[in-house]
Amino acid sequence: MRGVAEAFAGAGYDVELPRLPGHGTAVSDMIPSRWSDWSFEVAAAYARLAARVDKVVVAGLSMGGSLTLWTALQQPSVSGIVCINPASQPQAEEMIEMVKGMLAEGTEVFPGIGSDIADPNVKESSYPETPLAPLVSMVEDGIKPMLSKYGSCKIPMLLITSKNDHVVDPATSDELAAQWGGPVERILLDRSFHVATQDYDKDFINESALAFAAKVTA
């Protein structure tokens, strides 16, 4: 999300770009982190930004999109949200039970799913492994409790979806758009994969997010 944050800062907006607990260091730091840790950090970043400005737009990619949805549900005064390939629907119960079984057997990680990028000249800086317990927490502590609340939120959303996403099923964006209680503006990306903010459409995403922010904060 650094590119999005820099685009907003370059356009004159105040910006907060929190580094979530367990992210950007080592897999060993991620293993004990949970939804409560990430949401706490996001809430703190929101509070810092809201103390400086009158209107706030929240944006996130993937799990950051989940936290963007969570922030909208927690803060009804948010002017708008930008969700890019968000994890908004829980994985199949069978998969979660399988992961729990692996955890019970002592398996803490499985091969990573990072760098889902179409542009061969770009590689995402991501962990080589995906910790399992944080994944379960994201689904059970984060996404599942939000499902019944999507319809009550009236905050405008810009929903950006990669048609060829190998991490988050693009069909879940259709579900989110149908569930959301506020106006939803949709953009479908033909050229980019999951990490669209670093892919072929990154500049288009930045331009679209800036235009949306200008509209909802006018």
Spans of model-derived segments:
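Short, surface-exposed "cap/lid" segments of acyl-processing enzymes
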Residues: 1-26
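Catalytic nucleophile-loop/oxyanion-hole region of alpha/beta-hydrolase
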Residues: 26-52, 57
